[in-house]
């Protein structure tokens, strides 16, 4: 399995969770296969917690600042947040910059060009098929090796003065640990008002973690940073070391139990019967969401996220 194919796996999971009623996403139908299989309840639940928690932070970030905000998505693939957020907050308030491998960029660009509902969200745009890029007022897509950002900068224009959050959904973990560290430090140094949201597995050395790594390795997928950051506390210390002022890192079980409102939990739990409760709890403890921020961004956003404690 090529790393580029992991985006298709994630797409199938999001599509299943959307069709089952966990997630509201009117744009995923343009990307998902017409005959997408239903995922087991435990997978739908994990996809929901992942999507809800990331949306929770990013949307509160958008709502915490006036004027234009910027989201830089590493390994964005078929992620539909750009369309969901622009339709809700308006193109004048958001700039998305997305990076991925060439096949994933081309797949997204061609899907955008096919569907008016997607084109309307981003407005006028310019496409370079040979380079795998799309540039518009609210969305830029680049086929670009993110490791080169540290040495060569961004391939297009980036406004370093805008409040900015970098998003990595299982992307940084594919880099060598020193490469991931260099990139995170670069982001922290270059943006005055910034944060980073990172979703990735943890606890790779226990029995479940070893099984998870073996399954991924059998498919040709190696998470190179997994063994470096075993716990949520190690993830927290990692980003403090990068220079961020405030960091919170929680596993998915904690997020489900303490972040998600009771009524929302009741709604999602009524969708499907989850028989594998112990398996879910074990799985949820092996995935972590980290949110790190500069002091000025944290002080602004924490008013919208009073339940987050560092």
From Swiss-Prot:
Pfam families: LCM
GO CC annotation: mitochondrion
Keywords: Methyltransferase, S-adenosyl-L-methionine, Transferase
Example GO molecular function: protein C-terminal leucine carboxyl O-methyltransferase activity
Residues that, per the record, bind S-adenosyl-L-methionine: 50, 75, 100, 145-146, 169
Catalyzed chemical reaction(s): [phosphatase 2A protein]-C-terminal L-leucine + S-adenosyl-L-methionine = [phosphatase 2A protein]-C-terminal L-leucine methyl ester + S-adenosyl-L-homocysteine
S-S bonds: none
InterPro entries assigned: LCMT1, Ppm1/Ppm2/Tcmp, SAM-dependent_MTases_sf
Top EC group: transferase
EC id: 2.1.1.233
Any single GO BP term: methylation
Summary of the function given for this chain in its UniProt record: Methylates the carboxyl group of the C-terminal leucine residue of protein phosphatase 2A catalytic subunits to form alpha-leucine ester residues.
Family: Belongs to the methyltransferase superfamily. LCMT family.
Name of protein: Leucine carboxyl methyltransferase 1
Biological source species: Schizosaccharomyces pombe (strain 972 / ATCC 24843) (Fission yeast)
């Amino acid at each position: 399995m090529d790393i580029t194919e992991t985006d298709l796996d994630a797409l199938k999971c999001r599509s299943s969770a959307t069709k089952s009623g966990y997630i509201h996403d009117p744009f995923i139908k343009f990307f998902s296969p017409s005959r997408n299989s239903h995922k087991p309840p435990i997978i739908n639940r994990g996809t929901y917690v992942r999507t809800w928690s990331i949306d929770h932070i990013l949307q509160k970030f958008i709502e915490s600042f006036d004027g234009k905000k910027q989201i830089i998505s590493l390994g964005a693939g078929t992620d539909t947040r750009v369309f969901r957020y622009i339709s809700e907050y308006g193109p004048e308030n958001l700039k998305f910059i997305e990076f991925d491998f060439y096949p994933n960029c081309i797949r997204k660009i061609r899907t955008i060009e096919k569907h008016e509902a997607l084109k309307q969200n981003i407005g006028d745009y310019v496409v370079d098929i040979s380079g795998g890029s799309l540039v518009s007022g609210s969305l830029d897509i680049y086929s670009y090796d993110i490791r080169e950002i540290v040495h060569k900068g961004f391939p297009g224009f980036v406004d370093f003065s805008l409040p900015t959050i970098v998003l990595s959904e299982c992307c940084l973990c594919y880099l060598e640990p020193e490469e991931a560290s260099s990139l995170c430090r670069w982001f922290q140094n270059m943006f005055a008002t910034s944060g980073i949201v990172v979703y990735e597995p943890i606890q790779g050395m226990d029995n479940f973690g070893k099984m998870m790594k073996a399954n991924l390795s059998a498919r040709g997928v190696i998470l190179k940073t997994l063994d470096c950051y075993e716990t949520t506390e190690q993830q927290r210390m990692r980003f403090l070391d990068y220079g961020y002022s405030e960091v919170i890192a929680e596993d998915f079980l904690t997020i489900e139990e303490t972040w998600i409102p009771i009524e929302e939990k009741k709604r999602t739990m009524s969708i499907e019967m989850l028989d594998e409760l112990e398996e879910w709890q074990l799985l949820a403890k092996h995935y972590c969401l980290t949110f790190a921020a500069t002091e000025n961004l944290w002080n602004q956003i924490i008013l919208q996220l009073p339940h987050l404690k560092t």
